[in-house]
Amino acid sequence: MAERCIEILAIPEGKECLILDIGCGSGLSGSVLTDHGYEWIGVDISPSMLEVAKENEVEGDLINLDVGQGFSFRAGSFDYAISVSALQWLCIAEKSKYNVNKRLKNFFVSLYKCLNIGARCAFQFYPANPEQINLITKSALENGFTGGVVVDFPHSTKKKSIIYFYKLDSLKNLLKMLWMLFLKMRLMMMKKMKKLMLLEKEEN
């Protein structure tokens, strides 16, 4: 599943990057990132799972964190983020004091801040129902991301969903770059046309 997330992220070959592994658990997905040569930091709410990861001697740094309360990383720390089989827990209010919408907002607002410009995310999870997908997608779109949903094996009882997101400012930067390229090409064409008109004048 981590391989599928990496595939969706489409990381350029040879690119040095730092990846945030959300809900890293025992470090299985982190080990896949290591095999691909990526540096990573893993966060998980379960101290016991992080102990297992340490026993497995994973190469990433590990942090005990409830992502529903948000991240506290420095702005622009990560180039990519993945999550394998964890995001659905944000949609479950295990304690009466938990507010699902607030926890999702904390998650996406703080994630947006700690991602670099142009960052991409791929989150694989098992939704209990369509409402969970809608909740997660709605919160992401309201807090600076754009993206979509990929459903692998939709007719299987074990179907899984992968949501991919882009920082919205990366889309803005892309549109800005395309607009600047358009203006540059337009200017070049105008200069070329002007030159042709002058040549025609001289010939006449």
Model-derived segments and spans:
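Conserved alpha-helix/loop element of class I SAM-dependent methyltransferases that forms part
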Residues: 1-17, 32
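A short acidic, Gly/Pro-enriched loop at the edge of an enzyme's catalytic core
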Residues: 68-81
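A short beta-strand submotif of the Rossmann-like class I SAM-dependent methyltransferase core
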Residues: 83-86
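Conserved beta-strand signature within the Rossmann-like core of class I S-adenosyl-L-methionine
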Residues: 118-125
